């Protein structure tokens, strides 16, 4: 028989202590607090993708070359980065895979995204006859690898204002867009580009499918951002580079 004193005191279940709220990384916090400048432009070199599915890798290479002048533009590097970035996605490169490939090579990375799961990749997987369980396992694996490298993610919508804030905070945005919205002769598909800057005339974009930097009106660029309502932006700190990690990744 239960002790009556204990019964009274235990009638109300003890509440579990709440975990402290997760603090945003210094990189993401810096962007959040940044004041938008009149213009912000970085001299990021252009690199054209070698295949129709390697825009993620080509975009990563442009950022890596900006951060590390010793980094070489080579097809071998492009396909190596693509193999890592494609983990958790179908062909084009996942946000976690791309972030992981960059961080592994010395970049300091953050992610802004409005989705928490595989998103449109589930539909593409069915179209490409990729097993959904395999896709989910790959997605979760690369997500954990990204977390292990200290990559943090903020849930939010990628807008032209968010991109301006990122650039104003001295970070380099790699943004997911719809290929058809930026190249009318291409089919609608997920495509990654590097936004090197903006001024009163518009945004300057290193599109790996093009031969050089292109300029886009803010309203036109706004319509291009994201694919099937999924929005991802990989953010690299323009002033941080870990040479030791870069050397170890070779």
PLM regions: where:
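Internal catalytic-core helix/loop-beta-alpha segment
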Residues: 138-177, 181
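Short amphipathic alpha-helical segments and helix-helix/interface helices
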Residues: 98-99, 160-164, 193, 222
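Noncatalytic regulatory segments and standalone regulatory/sensor domains
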Residues: 18-32, 86, 167-168, 174, ...
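Active-site-adjacent structural segments surrounding the nucleophilic cysteine of cysteine proteases
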Residues: 2-148, 156-158, 186, 199, ...
């Amino acid at each position: 028989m239960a002790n009556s004193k204990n019964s009274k005191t235990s009638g109300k279940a003890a509440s579990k202590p709440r975990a402290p709220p997760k603090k945003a990384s210094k990189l993401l916090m810096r962007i959040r607090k940044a004041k938008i400048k009149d213009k912000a432009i970085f001299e990021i070199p252009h690199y054209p993708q070698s295949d129709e599915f390697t825009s993620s890798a080509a975009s990563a290479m442009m950022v890596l070359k900006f951060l590390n002048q010793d980094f070489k533009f080579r097809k071998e590097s492009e396909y190596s980065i693509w193999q890592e970035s494609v983990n958790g996605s179908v062909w084009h490169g996942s946000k976690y895979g791309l972030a992981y490939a960059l961080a592994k090579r010395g970049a300091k990375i953050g992610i802004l995204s409005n989705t928490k799961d595989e998103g449109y990749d589930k539909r593409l997987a069915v179209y490409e006859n990729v097993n959904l369980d395999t896709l989910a396992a790959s997605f979760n694996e690369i997500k954990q690898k990204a977390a292990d490298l200290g990559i943090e993610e903020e849930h939010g919508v990628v807008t032209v204002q968010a991109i301006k804030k990122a650039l104003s905070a001295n970070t380099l945005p790699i943004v997911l867009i719809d290929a058809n919205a930026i190249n009318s002769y291409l089919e609608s598909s997920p495509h990654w580009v590097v936004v090197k800057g903006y001024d009163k005339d518009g945004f300057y974009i290193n599109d790996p499918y093009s031969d050089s930097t292109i300029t886009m009106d803010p309203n036109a660029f706004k319509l291009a951002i994201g694919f099937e309502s999924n929005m991802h932006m990989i953010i690299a700190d323009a002033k941080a580079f870990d040479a030791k990690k870069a050397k170890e990744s070779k």
